[in-house]
């Protein structure tokens, strides 16, 4: 296998709906050259190509792999990492330059969306921390046993639909604004889902509006979660009254959602969802095909080398 120990392998993921998406790469490229970074890069052409490109980088011996993208691109990268033998994976580190419609995992580490210099300097310093991943284990419609890892969160129910609406907004500016009107639809849709969930010794068997299982901040629904304690935070949201729902928006955007009376927080290593009728599921901000039958969500401790500020 060829060796590229010190050279960065960069996967550039253009932001969906952005005006002149290549402008961001031009800025990244200038910063890399100004700091004399040795790198190779490839550009992702489709939403599903990141995994293939990261695998190519790993097979070509790169030890520092950088994703210029958002949560979904990072999700594809870590799922590729987890298909790599542990002894090989332990020698590779993952960095990010935020460039997605949603960059929640980068925000957890106080990385700014448009501060390219900060991100490049962070990767150049190469301060690495082993982080946890969440993992959903399920059966697909063909009866096959499947799994998918996540960095940030899994959302089940209405919030999964809201996140998807936000992703569909055209342009970065509209995307940031779209979460508010999409969320306001909750008031009028009044959607609930019949769920049966086991969290340690607790059993929740009732109608639920949304469940968020967070390895990190979970778009505000698991604000106390951290990806290095071997635990998942779970927020189960029952259906509030309209006045309480408006209050909930304020608490969500101020990072205090756990103070809301309709939000029931848990911390665990495993959650079993025995039933979630009609509920959509999103993994790191992207909808997945709904599992057939029960599914399990677990945490896998210290499995990825992530470059942090």
Task: Label the predicted regions.
Residues 170-177, 224-246:
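Gly/Ser/Thr-rich active-site loops/lids in small-molecule metabolic enzymes
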Residues 1-68, 79, 121:
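ATP/NTP phosphate-donor binding region
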Residues 199, 236-309:
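ATP/nucleoside-binding phosphotransfer catalytic cores, i.e., glycine-rich phosphate-binding loops
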Residues 155, 159, 212-223:
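Glycine-rich phosphate/pyrophosphate-binding beta-alpha loops
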Residues 2, 35, 83-209:
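Catalytic core of DAGKc-family lipid kinases
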Residues 191-193, 207-209, 228-232, 267-269:
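A generic structural signal for short beta-strands and their flanking turns/coil linkers
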Residues 50, 73-77, 131:
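Short glycine/serine/threonine-rich phosphate/pyrophosphate-binding segments
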């Amino acid at each position: 296998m060829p060796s590229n120990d010190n050279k960065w392998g960069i996967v550039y993921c253009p932001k969906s709906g952005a005006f002149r998406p290549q402008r961001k790469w031009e800025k990244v490229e200038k910063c890399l050259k100004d700091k004399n970074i040795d790198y190779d890069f490839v550009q992702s052409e489709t939403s599903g190509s990141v995994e293939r490109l990261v695998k190519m980088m790993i097979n070509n011996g790169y030890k520092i792999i950088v994703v210029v993208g958002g949560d979904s691109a990072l999700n594809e990268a870590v799922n590729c990492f987890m298909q790599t033998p542990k002894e090989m994976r332990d020698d590779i580190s993952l960095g990010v330059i935020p460039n997605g419609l949603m960059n929640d995992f980068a925000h957890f580490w106080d990385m700014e969306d448009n501060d390219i210099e900060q991100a490049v300097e962070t990767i150049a310093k190469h301060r690495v921390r082993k982080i946890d991943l969440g993992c959903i284990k399920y059966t697909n419609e063909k009866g096959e046993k499947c799994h998918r890892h996540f960095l940030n969160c899994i959302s089940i129910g209405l919030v999964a639909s809201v996140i998807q609406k936000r992703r569909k907004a055209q342009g970065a500016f509209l995307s940031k604004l779209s979460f508010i009107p999409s969320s306001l639809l909750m008031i009028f849709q009044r959607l609930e889902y019949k769920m049966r969930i086991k969290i340690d010794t607790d059993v929740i068997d009732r109608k639920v509006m949304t469940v968020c299982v967070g390895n990190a901040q979970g778009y505000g629904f698991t604000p106390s979660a951290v990806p290095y304690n071997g635990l998942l935070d779970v927020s189960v949201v029952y259906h509030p009254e309209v006045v309480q729902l408006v209050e909930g928006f304020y608490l969500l955007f101020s990072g205090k959602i756990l103070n809301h009376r309709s939000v029931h927080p848990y911390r665990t290593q495993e959650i079993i969802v025995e039933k979630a009728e009609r509920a959509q599921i999103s993994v790191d901000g992207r909808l997945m095909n709904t599992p057939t039958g029960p599914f399990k969500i677990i945490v896998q401790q210290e499995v990825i080398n992530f470059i942090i500020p």
